[in-house]
Design a protein with these regions (language model features):
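Cytosolic regulatory modules rich in charged/polar residues
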Residues: 2-181, 288-316, 323-337
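Transmembrane alpha-helix detector for multi-pass membrane proteins
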Residues: 137-156, 171-246, 251-252, 257-263, ...
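Hydrophobic alpha-helical transmembrane segments of membrane transport and translocation systems
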Residues: 227-229, 233-338
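Conserved, well-folded catalytic cores of nucleic-acid-processing
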Residues: 4-8, 45-52, 87, 91, ...
Length: 338
């Protein structure tokens, strides 16, 4: 970090946590950019509990989350020093836990989980295209199975006749309902994914690819599922893999099943209800006093909102985000010619 930010105002504070482990934590921040209230709130939260030991930062993360019941992560993690340095310049705090290969970034936001470190290495047109693609992939990963069930069970009138007949022909001979069919295949792919993670090396990747192909083809040949369901599950899985942060993607993997049952038993009304409840939950989340949906809520400037969905050119990113100290809000200006 010192190689990337040679600034005397970048401070490193050490603290110990864990009665028996005495795990060393390091808090990194830039003194004139971070809000002192935010910094103090983070310190207070870290010192709130007395525990035998903190062995890895995942324990620290789950112990100090404000909304511990929420599936959405409230700490952002990174293994890349360049990403951590970028967030320090935005006025955030980076927490490094002893014996852990990645750092925690505070506060976190919905938009931050959808950003990739590679965005800053691409030209802004390509980076903006990739961000839009990620948001579309997110909607696909969460809503596609539920929308399919809602349409095929309750709203067939919105489909063209030829497409509806094609769906009916594909499902001919399948003994299960469309809900059971989709849940069976989704859980099968979850098993394959988990097996691929547990098996080491390239063999795990081979299990994921070959296992998916074999199970999908065998299920279609045995008339257990229809081909369209295999395609929907595959698109859903691909959409989830596009999300840069794995913890964030895992939250939506769980949410996918909620929308699946809402769409399967309540139709489009269930999908709309699920979207409303999810948006309400996300709107109520705070990360150390910062709204989780920043910059899409509150009094964010329109440029902040634009830089959330798109990646603005560097020369247009002149103002720091709202959570940085506003006395140092300007981060880019032209030099005056002498």
């Amino acid at each position: 970090m010192r190689k990337r930010l040679r600034d005397t105002r970048m401070k490193v504070e050490e603290m110990s946590i864990g009665v028996r482990s005495n795990t060393v934590l390091q808090l990194l921040y830039i003194e004139d950019l971070v809000h002192q209230e935010l910094l103090q709130a983070i310190k207070d939260r870290l010192e709130e509990f007395e525990i035998d030991g903190i062995l890895y930062s995942g324990m620290l993360e789950q112990l100090t989350e404000e909304a511990w019941y929420s599936p959405f992560p409230q700490y952002q993690t990174t293994e890349r020093p360049d990403r951590a340095a970028q967030e320090l310049l935005n006025g955030k705090v980076v927490v490094i836990c002893d014996n852990t290969p990645y750092a925690l970034i505070l506060p976190s936001s919905f938009n931050g989980f959808m950003e990739s470190s590679e965005d800053w290495y691409h030209h802004f047109e390509m980076a903006s295209f990739l961000r839009i693609l990620r948001y579309l992939a997110l909607m696909t990963a969460v809503l596609l199975p539920g929308l399919y069930l809602a349409v095929i069970r309750f709203h067939t009138q919105i489909l063209p006749t030829n497409l509806l007949l094609s769906f009916a022909e594909a499902r001919e001979g399948v003994p299960f309902s469309s809900v059971v069919e989709l849940v069976f295949l989704e859980l099968s792919f979850e098993l394959i994914r988990e097996a691929g993670v547990r098996v080491p090396g390239s063999l795990g990747n081979a299990i994921g690819i070959v296992g998916g192909l074999i199970i999908g083809q065998a299920a279609v040949s045995a008339n257990l599922v229809s081909p369209i369901v295999v395609m929907i599950v595959a698109l859903t899985a691909l959409g989830g893999m596009v999300i840069p942060n794995e913890e964030f993607a895992s939250a939506f993997r769980l949410l996918k099943y909620v929308f699946l049952f809402l769409g399967g038993y309540l139709g489009i009304f269930g999908i709309v209800l699920g979207i409303y409840l999810t948006a309400a939950h996300l709107s109520g989340l705070l990360s150390f006093g910062i709204p989780y949906l920043l910059p899409f809520v509150k009094k964010s400037p329109i440029k902040d909102v634009g830089d959330g969905i798109l990646r603005l050119p560097f020369r247009k990113r002149r103002i720091r985000p709202l959570y940085a100290r506003q006395e140092q809000s300007l981060r880019l200006k032209r030099r005056e010619k002498s």
